[in-house]
């Protein structure tokens, strides 16, 4: 059994097709959506979205946060930004984590703690996504 899934960002539609399962990172941990799931709307934290497409092939995306809507015949992910996990660069993600950590440690008079922690959380989620993909698929 499959359900139609759309992943949409501010830049446009990133994915549209039939999937057997959607696994996303919500506020209370990972959530798996299969055909027949009860209707639901929840917010998503930065991290990977894994799609098990029709036929069992997996495709992974990174989202910087957003919302997940589940209806009887449709799953929709509305995200701020979306990248295919294969397009993420581990070295860049590590550098972003280090830069965010440095900014947190070197607070100045005009320091914005909320912005700095948000940058750190997003960079760490990107790095986690890259590492999960590399571990799972040996890339």
Curated annotation (Swiss-Prot):
Major subcellular site: membrane
Gene Ontology MF term list: ATP binding; proton-transporting ATP synthase activity, rotational mechanism
Gene3D superfamilies associated with the record: ATP synthase delta/epsilon subunit, C-terminal domain, F0F1 ATP synthase delta/epsilon subunit, N-terminal
InterPro entries per record: ATP_F1_dsu/esu_C_sf (IPR036794), ATP_synth_F1_dsu/esu (IPR001469), ATP_synth_F1_dsu/esu_N (IPR020546), ATP_synth_F1_esu_C (IPR020547), ATPsynth_dsu/esu_N (IPR036771)
Membrane topology: Peripheral membrane protein
Cellular compartments annotated: Cell inner membrane
GO CC terms of this entry: plasma membrane; proton-transporting ATP synthase complex
Keywords: ATP synthesis, Cell inner membrane, Cell membrane, CF(1), Hydrogen ion transport, Ion transport, Membrane, Transport
Subunit structure: F-type ATPases have 2 components, CF(1) - the catalytic core - and CF(0) - the membrane proton channel. CF(1) has five subunits: alpha(3), beta(3), gamma(1), delta(1), epsilon(1). CF(0) has three main subunits: a, b and c.
Matching NCBIfam families: ATP_synt_epsi, PRK00571.1-4
Protein family: Belongs to the ATPase epsilon chain family.
Function description: Produces ATP from ADP in the presence of a proton gradient across the membrane.
Protein name per UniProt: ATP synthase epsilon chain
